[in-house]
Swiss-Prot record:
Location of the RdRp catalytic domain: 1416-1537
PTM annotation (O-(5'-phospho-RNA)-tyrosine): residues: Y896
Region (Acidic), start-end ranges: 893-898
Site (Critical for determining viral persistence): D94
Disulfide bonds: C1482-C1484
One cellular-component annotation, GO: host cell mitochondrion
Keyword Amino-acid biosynthesis assigned: no
GO MF, one annotated term: RNA helicase activity
Impact when changing L1531D: Complete loss of oligomerization of RdRp in the presence of VPg and RNA. Decreased interaction of VPg with RdRp. No production of infectious particles
Protein name: Genome polyprotein
Length: 1687
């Protein structure tokens, strides 16, 4: 005999039952199902395993070796094994396939196993049957079923398959198999018999069934793969007569089923309904074209509805309305697989949504329904308990009368199936389990579970019949486990574990750190508890070893360092290691941990004279030296004091400094056996990330199989998976997929992927297996497995799935188009009826007419000279009435200056409205004087517009403009008449001023009074009850919140939510007079009082010696509130004032004072922050203005100088500018190039984005992790800096810029070369003293507009000019002293850190770009309005990093808080408060901006990829310079989600070419732009070249003194030769041709300007720019002759 080995699969074996015998010669007793492994009866001989098989434990099924039964199973158990094997293999391609291991299936598959007494005798019915030959398998049979014909597919053995029993004429039917029992005849036969097994795969599938279209014949066509329909039936041939179902090959057919009359009536109704939606009726309507006939009768009126009607009629005329294009194929392409199973699946998705909508419509929620069902639930539980009791009693009675069968044999049968599955898995997947640690562990775990279950059964049933079976099962489990362990012990290689050795002095916390590190690494590998230990010293027993992923080896070398080194060499190797164990069950245990963490006190891993020093050092992947100066200092100060040492240690191990030696190193200095390397500072997070990455890298290198893509199972799904793994974008994937549909072989399909990198993989196509890959544009295809035996019927199941989905899509499209067609038809008919029935008015016509003499046209203007049209009044797009204080009515800059002079002369009590009235009055007087001078006194005065309007109103005349302003329905009553209003007022209704509980919980005790939580971040209170400055509040330090005040109103803003349990409320600046609000008074005794207050006006009230600003109110509790205990008392200050505005509760202020009677109260309201830090000098200030400026609140009058109307740009030649050339920005209303608004209006347009709402913050946990990772990165790379002195801070400032507020002078005027003198000297000294004392100073910024070259669209189109912020000199000095050292440290590391401030494009650029080129993907983004979209919360997180890394953190914290507090910006007329956006103008602004850019980009990448920030930074390279960026990464980023994340943060990212849409990523660095330079590469490296447009602009324009006419020319100056030389260097990078063009223009300019300069050759300039030399000795191969040619 030969053996067959099935593959593995989970299954549950059905309990085997014996057939009932008609006659039995011998009585037998059975205790259930016979044992699968042994038999005690002759009747069950078919279940026995032959004796010769018991000696072969590896055999799973016995087959006949010779004779007529060769290759067939010996027993039924063997047959089950073979059936299981076949099912396991076919299940991979057909997951829906069911496992049938019953006796019926066995006898049908293997008839020789059927007992003789069970085989039918096949009675003869020759007298009733007309003999017919058995049809060919796969034939379509037409059967006479009374009123109609029924079709099915013959599959052999007298069985037919198809939709034999549909439940209704329109339903979801199931493909089934039944006996042939109707008169039949074959109407279609295949050329060759089809595979019956392949046909049977369709059994059990569901298909849509419609009696008139998708019926039994259509399903038969789907099964056999022919193209035909029931309406055509072109493939049917009716040459043969009908035959009787009783034949020799069809025994005992069943009686035909005759449906009832009710069933026939219901089927008729369903058929009629389906015919309405079906296409025949629509085709008939399309041929008649009823809408086209209607369109001939009626015409279009060219209204909106008429146009819609015309489009409908045109659609009908061109046959696209009633028969729209078939979109079934397009809908099918959306689905990756044909998996739609029918309306049931659709109902699972749609029904919950519909039920939810119905519940919402009726106001039902889960809470209300839960309350209603609570009582029902309790009653059901009681009834359930009673029912359980009754069932138990009933079971006992039934068991006494009819004993049940023993369930143990069924359990044993199930266990045998599971063991067969494991044995098959061991046989077929052994190599994969040995290579994959998780698969091997899962296999052993399943064996342990099965062994436990078998032992439970053996302990429960101790009879002899069960004991033999359980023992045999246990033996098979032990053999499987032993076979796996033996195979694992015989491996020739394994994954080498990662070794981390931490060396340092004792007692500094190394062991605790390593334990924590082990847990973190284990958690990163997927099992946090998988941490073990290695026995040390003389203990050499590994019984406690459980195969943990991470093991800890403490005190390496404590006893015998040479012995420990030998053990380390053995464990940290790829050769398998068998451990020494004492217990017999642990014999043969292997060491398979992935990470080994070692602690030691030695300075070197092993002695330097050790013979295998190099081998040991090579096996240590991370040699880390731990130092703790803090612990050493504590021990030195307090020897023997354990508490002092513990106090010096930190739970985050920040007291330990870790230094990473180079790989293979053996000491602290970085020496290796091959020379000296570089040591690095590393953190715990980075060490953990590197170790985990190395583990995964080695595991991937140790992998066994490539990915497999099965195109036979599903072409679309396999292609999508293959393209996604190759990194092909979705839009390119769709284009390649369309081309691949026409490919006939794998070679053609791989040729389409030649432009992409396809890793080696396997492809299954048409039964054959191919090894394919595409590396560096070379596709490779190798056939490794030929297809199996050819079959005439291929993938019939797939065809049915495809046809079924196509049918569903067609049905859905038919229903939708039927609804649209009905709606369109109704609309067209209604439109025509409504058009003919509505009345016609003369004003409906689009033309004017006159009836005769004296008639007038009401549509024409009455421009007859005696009146002027007033235009529309009321609110329009430009506002209501006359413009306010911030709309200058088109005033020029001179008129605006005149208005300011008049305001100053009148003491500030002069508005723009007054100025406009005075100007109009003066113009009228001037006109009158001129006319008197010309015509004399006798000439009548000319009527002004205002006088003419007054005269018309007096006479009762109406102008044409008034007539046109009227609406046609002015005389119609809108809404119901007042007489029909039946509403009534309930004068007895009681008004409840009590606030809900959720608002009362916001009132908390604070300081000496109370406070109120507006949101989780904002807390308000009265200023005089708050604790002193610098006090910790609600557990938060002063650095975690900002404080602003307005009078006695105090507001705290916390950076992180203190009360996340409460939603945000609306905080308003007081309310309108007459509003009734509630003051929520809380007392320490627990009393809560809600007092109604009618709010009055805003006022300043003197209470004692203090003046309180707020809103007054009158209590509605009576004349003497305090006497009745219904008023406020001392201690109630800080309680909130709230009122309900619509359905929303609003808080308007806090309680600060009350009169003695208690009837009048005062609420401090939320105004703008006071300017208490400002030191105003000079005469008394004017009353502080109120209102807003460009949406931003006004704080005070401004002092900034007027905006400049001059430019520093001059033309280099008088030639005309080329089209599209850039020009200096707009210069104001005097600009001769264009007639535009004032510069103040341009500035207001630039300020508006600062008042817009901000975006959302990144998730808190992601933001915290990103900030920690960035801080760790900077802390490990930046060198410690020394604080700057006052002199160095002054020297670092640019002396050619303005000093800002309050002097606004150039800094060089008061600079002696070493110090500031005069006014600026006093200001700088005062700021330096405030810094050194750690006191706060509020920065005051000055707004200006940048003078720069811009696109013509920003001058002649929509005028734009960039906004500049200039800080005062004091803020510059304080910021330079606080953050100057940090900025210098960043500049020194600009090549290694992502912040590139301070980089040189020609010197540092090649190194930076080379780092980017090491990664796979590259992207750059251009951000719109970067500064105005920034959030102060993100800037504060960036500022916290700068503060912690500055040399003086305590003093730097004060400066950073001042910089990030609400900014005070001087715009000339006013000082405004800006609470959001980036405040610029300080020495550290660029670094702060770049750091915030780094945080936002990293947060977006972490949120999209869900990868730890340290790993993201390890797999990526960033370059940030303000808002400019370049990002390179190896991670697979979803660019749509990445772009949406950035927009969710409030940013406005666009592509580099300013196109809208998701950001694009490239697989090459070529073409990425950074700092206006395109990154290109050649054989010598990467470099950045300036774009040609910038080079051309520098040839057209030069800088000089300010002037008004930008087109004036300036002769050559002293700096121009160096500028032109640098320009030649930039042009040399674009190739010799472009260099010659620029060189000729430079020579021409030099000749015209009298500049003496020599233009070098292109090659010399290129050497100078690229390699820093112009010598002729430069090697010829480095000249890059053919590299930089023009594109």
């Amino acid at each position: 005999m030969r053996m067959a080995t099935p593959s593995s699969a989970p299954s549950v074996r059905n309990t085997e039952k014996r057939k009932n015998k008609k006659a039995s010669s011998k009585a037998s007793v059975s205790f259930g199902a016979p044992s699968p492994l042994s038999s005690e009866s002759e009747d069950e001989i078919n279940y026995m395993t032959p004796p010769e098989q018991e000696a072969q434990p590896g055999a799973l099924a016995a087959l006949h070796a010779e004779g007529p039964l060769a290759g067939l199973p010996v027993t039924r158990s063997d047959a089950r094994v073979l059936i299981f094997n076949e099912w396991e293999e076919r299940k991979k391609s057909d997951p829906w396939l069911r496992l049938d291991m019953s006796d019926k299936a066995i006898f049908r598959r293997y008839p020789h196993l059927r007992p003789k007494e069970d085989r039918p005798d096949a009675p003869s019915h020759a007298e009733d049957a007309m003999d017919a030959k058995e049809p060919v398998i796969g034939s379509i049979l037409e059967q006479d079923d009374h009123k109609f014909y029924h079709y099915s597919v013959y599959i052999g053995g007298g069985l037919v398959m198809g939709v034999n029993n549909p439940s209704a004429a329109v339903c979801q039917a199931t493909i089934d198999v039944e006996k042939l029992h109707l008169w039949w005849r074959p109407v279609w036969e295949p050329r060759h018999p089809l595979d019956s097994a392949e046909l049977r795969k369709c059994v059990g599938m569901t298909v849509p069934y419609v009696a008139t279209t998708v019926n039994c014949y259509q399903v038969c066509c789907w099964i056999v793969g022919i193209k035909d329909t029931w309406l055509k039936r072109a493939k049917i041939s009716r040459d043969l007569p009908f035959y009787s179902p009783v034949q020799d090959w069809n025994v005992d057919p069943q009686e035909p089923f005759i449906p009832s009359k009710l069933r026939m009536v219901s089927d008729g109704i369903l058929v009629a309904l389906s015919a309405v939606i079906g296409r025949p009726i629509k085709n008939l309507l399309a041929s008649v074209k009823p809408l086209n006939i209607l369109n001939i009768v009626l015409s279009c009126d060219w209204t909106f509805s008429g146009i819609v009607n015309a489009l409908i009629l045109l659609a009908e005329l061109f046959d696209i309305f009633w028969t729209p294009p078939d979109v079934t194929n397009w809908m099918i392409s959306i689905f990756g697989e044909w998996q739609a199973e029918g309306p049931f699946d659709l109902a699972l998705d749609v029904v919950p949504t519909l039920l939810g909508g119905i519940g919402m419509a009726f106001g039902l929620t889960s809470e209300t329904i839960g309350r209603k069902l609570a009582s029902t639930n309790s009653a059901l539980k009681a009834a359930q308990e009673m029912g359980k009791f009754a069932i138990e009693v009933f079971k006992q009675i039934m068991a006494w009368i009819w004993p049940s069968e023993d369930p143990v044999p069924a359990l044993l049968s199930n266990m045998e199936q599971a063991i067969i599955k494991n044995e098959c898995q061991l046989e077929n997947q052994l190599t994969a389990m040995l290579r994959d640690r998780n698969a091997g562990a899962e296999f052993l775990r399943s064996l342990d579970e099965e062994e436990q279950e078998v032992r439970k059964i053996a302990a429960k049933c101790g009879n002899s019949a069960t004991t033999g079976t359980t023992n045999a099962l246990l033996a098979r489990i032990s053999m499987a486990r032993a076979a796996f362990e033996k195979a694992r012990a015989e491996q020739t290689s394994r994954v080498r574990p990662v070794v981390i050795m931490v060396s340092g002095r004792p007692g500094i916390g190394k062991t605790c750190f390593c334990q924590n590190l082990a847990k973190r690494i284990a958690a990163s590998l997927g099992d946090e508890t998988s941490v073990g230990i290695i026995p040390r010293a003389d203990v050499d027993h590994w019984d406690a070893y459980k195969g943990a992923r991470v093991v800890l080896w403490d005190d390496f070398g404590m006893d015998n360092v040479v012995k420990d080194a030998l053990r380390l060499q053995m464990l940290a190797d790829t050769c398998p290691v068998t451990l020494n164990c004492d217990r017999i069950e642990n014999k043969g245990k292997m060491f398979d941990s992935q990470v080994i963490i070692i602690t030691t006190n030695q300075q070197t891993p092993v002695p330097l004279d050790y013979v295998n020093l190099e081998a040991v050092c090579r096996r240590i992947d991370f040699l880390v030296y731990a130092e703790s100066p803090v612990v050493d200092d504590a021990r030195a100060r307090a020897p023997g004091d354990v508490n002092a040492v513990k106090a010096a240690m930190r739970p985050d191990y920040s007291h330990i400094n870790f230094i990473l030696a180079p790989q293979g190193g053996f000491d602290r200095q970085g020496n290796t056996p091959y020379g000296k390397g570089v040591t690095k500072i590393i953190g715990a997070t980075a060490l953990c990330a590197r170790a985990v990455a190395l583990v995964h890298e080695r595991h991937d290198d140790f992998g066994l199989q490539n990915k497999v893509y099965d195109f036979d199972a599903g072409k679309i799904t396999a292609f999508k998976a293959m393209a996604a793994d190759a990194g092909i974008p979705w839009y390119k994937m769709a284009a390649i997929g369309c081309k691949a549909m026409g490919c006939t072989c794998v070679e053609e399909a791989m040729h389409l992927l030649k432009d992409y990198e396809v890793a080696p993989c396997q492809v299954i196509y048409n039964g054959a297996t191919y090894n394919v890959s595409c590396i560096k544009g070379a596709p490779m295809v190798e056939k490794v497995k030929e297809p199996e035996l050819p079959k005439t019927l291929v993938n019939c199941v797939r065809r049915i799935k495809e046809a079924r989905l196509r049918c569903y899509c067609r049905m859905a499209a038919d229903v939708i188009t039927s609804i649209l067609q009905a709606a369109g038809t109704a609309f067209s008919i209604y439109h025509q009826i409504e058009k003919r029935s509505r009345p016609s008015f003369y004003w409906d016509r689009g033309y004017t007419y006159r009836d005769g003499p004296g008639s007038f046209d009401i549509f024409e203007d009455d421009d007859d000279g005696w009146y002027h049209s007033e235009g529309k009044k009321g609110k329009n797009k430009k506002g209501r009435g006359r413009p306010g204080v911030f709309r200058t009515r088109g005033l020029t800059d001179e008129e605006y200056d005149e208005f300011k002079k008049r305001r100053e002369s009148r003491g500030g009590k002069y508005s723009i409205d007054d100025y406009l009235a005075d100007r109009e009055r003066e113009e009228e007087l001037l006109e009158r004087d001129e006319e008197e001078a010309i015509f004399g006194d006798g000439f009548g005065l000319k009527a002004t517009r205002r006088s003419r309007k007054a005269e018309r109103a007096k006479l009762g005349l109406v102008s044409g403009g008034d007539i046109r302003a009227r609406k046609p329905i002015d005389w119609n009553v809108v809404g119901p008449s007042w007489a029909d209003d039946d509403r009534q007022v309930d004068y007895g209704e009681k008004i409840n001023f009590e606030a809900p509980v959720s608002i009362w919980s916001r009132v908390v005790q604070f300081g000496t009074g109370w406070g109120f939580w507006v949101s989780g971040h904002v807390f308000i209170t009265a200023k005089h009850v708050a604790p002193p400055k610098g006090t910790e509040i609600f557990g938060r330090k002063p650095g975690d919140f900002t404080v602003t005040s307005s009078g006695d109103f105090l507001k705290y803003y916390f950076t992180s939510a203190v009360r996340p349990d409460i939603p945000a409320m609306v905080l308003e600046n007081g309310c309108q007079e007459g509003v009734v609000a509630s003051v929520l008074v809380k007392r320490a005794s627990g009393e809560m009082l809600a007092l109604a207050v009618r709010m009055g006006s805003q006022a300043a009230i003197k209470i004692g010696s203090a003046v309180v600003h707020g809103q007054t109110g009158m209590l509605l509790t009576g004349s003497n509130a305090k006497a009745q205990d219904l008023g406020t008392i001392p201690g109630d200050c800080g309680c909130p004032y709230v009122y309900k505005k619509g359905n929303t509760w609003v808080v308007i202020g806090v309680h600060v004072a009350a009169t003695r009677s208690g009837n009048t109260v005062i609420a401090a309201t939320h105004g703008e922050p006071t300017l208490e830090a400002l030191e105003f000098q000079g005469p008394p200030m004017l009353p502080r203005p109120s209102g807003t400026y460009a949406g931003l609140p006004i704080a005070d009058y401004g002092d900034a100088p007027p905006l400049s109307t001059k430019t520093m740009f001059w033309r280099t030649s008088p030639e005309k500018l080329p089209p599209g050339a850039w020009e200096p920005a707009y210069l104001g209303s005097k600009d001769e190039r264009v007639d535009g608004p004032s510069l103040q209006q341009v500035m207001r347009d630039q300020l508006k984005p600062y008042s817009e709402p901000r975006g959302l913050l990144p998730p808190q946990e992601i933001l915290d992790a990103v900030c920690d990772a960035i801080e760790n990165r900077l802390e490990n790379t930046l060198e410690p800096q020394k604080p700057w002195t006052f002199k160095k801070a002054c020297e670092s400032l640019d002396k050619n810029t303005s000093s800002g507020y309050p002097y606004h002078k150039q800094k060089s005027k008061d600079w002696t070369g070493s110090a500031f003198i005069g006014d600026l000297g006093d200001q700088a000294t005062h700021a330096n003293n405030m810094y050194e004392m750690g006191k706060s100073m509020r920065p005051i910024y000055t707004a200006a507009l940048k003078d720069e070259l811009v696109k013509p669209d920003k001058i002649y189109g929509k005028i734009k000019k960039r906004l500049l912020w200039g800080s005062d000199l004091g803020t510059m000095i304080r910021a330079a002293r606080a953050f100057g050292p940090f900025c210098d440290a960043l500049k020194e590391t600009c090549i290694f850190n992502p912040i590139r401030v301070g980089m040189s494009m020609n010197e540092d650029g090649p190194f930076i770009f080379a780092r980017h080129a090491n990664f796979r993907y590259h992207m750059d983004a251009d951000y719109t309005r970067w500064d105005s979209t920034q959030q102060r919360a993100i800037l504060k997180r960036a500022g916290d990093i700068m503060v912690r890394l500055s040399p003086e953190p305590d003093l730097a914290r004060v400066v950073m808080d001042d910089l990030l507090a609400p900014s005070l910006l001087d715009v000339g007329d006013y000082k405004i408060v800006v609470e959001e956006g980036l405040p610029s103008g300080c020495p550290c602004t660029t670094q702060l901006n770049s750091l915030a850019h780094w945080i936002l980009t990293l947060c977006a990448m972490v949120e999209v990829t869900r990868v730890d920030p340290d790993i993201v930074m390890q797999e990526s390279e960033f370059s940030f310079y303000g808002d400019d960026e370049v990002v390179s990464t190896n991670l697979e980023l979803d660019m749509v989600k990445y772009t949406m994340a950035l927009r969710r943060y409030g940013l406005l990212p666009t592509r580099a070419d300013k196109e809208e849409g998701p950001l694009e990523r490239r697989q090459t660095l070529q073409g990425i732009s950074f700092l206006r330079r395109a990154i290109v590469g050649d054989q010598f490296g990467w470099y950045g070249r300036l774009d040609r447009a910038s080079i051309d602009r520098q040839l057209l324009w030069t800088k000089g003194p300010n002037h008004q006419n930008p087109f004036e020319t300036l002769p050559g100056h002293a700096q121009r030769p160096s500028q032109l030389m640098a320009l030649l260097g930039e042009a040399a990078m674009h190739g010799e041709k472009y260099y010659r063009t620029v060189a000729s223009r430079v020579s021409k300019e030099a000749a015209q300007s009298g500049i003496e300069m020599v233009v070098p050759r292109h090659r010399s300039v290129l050497r100078w720019v690229r390699f820093g030399t112009m010598d002729a000795e430069t090697p010829q191969e480095r000249s890059a002759v053919f590299v930089n040619e023009d594109e």
